[in-house]
Amino acid sequence: MAGRLDEDLKDVTLLGNQNTKYLFEYSPKILEVFDNNHPNRDYFVKFNCPEFTSLCPKTGQPDFATIYISYIPEQRMVESKSLKLYLFSFRNHGDFHEDCMNVIMNDLIKLMDPRYIEVWGKFTPRGGISIDPYCNYGRPGTKYEQMADYRMMNHDLYPETIDNR
């Protein structure tokens, strides 16, 4: 199979752009998609995002996390540079950890309409406690809905060694 044609990438405007503007306020409008060339098969796409930051909505203190985003695409896929810039836009966004993860998941569902998606934030401790919110979604009425239920019930059965924070 040949690579993608320029026509296939017409909606990808941020990748390769040397004049990238970093937004410091939450903005889902920056997200871009491209077509999935393999919609006839299930496969995971996973993003490991170790530099996520947001602000505590009460104190304004910065929060830091590694975020893991995994999804099974349908017709559209999120472009990685736009995802990076979107996550950066949380830098001055005041929200609780749990809210940030659900907002990210909801924005990606709206953007891509994936078969399945999960978002897991592993935040660095504040006050001696780390918070690791996990949320997922499987398309209703499909096997992915059952998959989401199963993964939710089994997502954290094995306690981790906290050595990366």
Curated annotation (Swiss-Prot):
GO MF entries: preQ1 synthase activity
One Gene Ontology cellular component: cytoplasm
Keyword Cytoplasm attached: yes
Pathway as given in its UniProt record: tRNA modification; tRNA-queuosine biosynthesis
InterPro entries xrefs: GTP-CH-I_C/QueF (IPR043133), NADPH_dep_7-cyano-7-deazaG_red (IPR050084), QueF (IPR029500), QueF_type1 (IPR016856)
A biological-process GO annotation: queuosine biosynthetic process
Subcellular location field: Cytoplasm
Catalytic residues, chain numbering: 56, 63
EC number in record: 1.7.1.13
Keyword annotations of the record: Cytoplasm, NADP, Oxidoreductase, Queuosine biosynthesis
Stored Pfam families: QueF
Residue numbers binding substrate: 78-80, 97-98
Disulfide bridge map: none
Predominant location: cytoplasm
Highest taxon, organism lineage: Bacteria
Catalytic activity: 7-aminomethyl-7-carbaguanine + 2 NADP(+) = 7-cyano-7-deazaguanine + 2 NADPH + 3 H(+)
Family per similarity comment: Belongs to the GTP cyclohydrolase I family. QueF type 1 subfamily.
Job description of the protein: Catalyzes the NADPH-dependent reduction of 7-cyano-7-deazaguanine (preQ0) to 7-aminomethyl-7-deazaguanine (preQ1).
Name of the protein in question: NADPH-dependent 7-cyano-7-deazaguanine reductase
Organism, as annotated: Bacillus thuringiensis subsp. konkukian (strain 97-27)
Organism ancestry: Bacteria, Bacillati, Bacillota, Bacilli, Bacillales
Underlying gene: queF
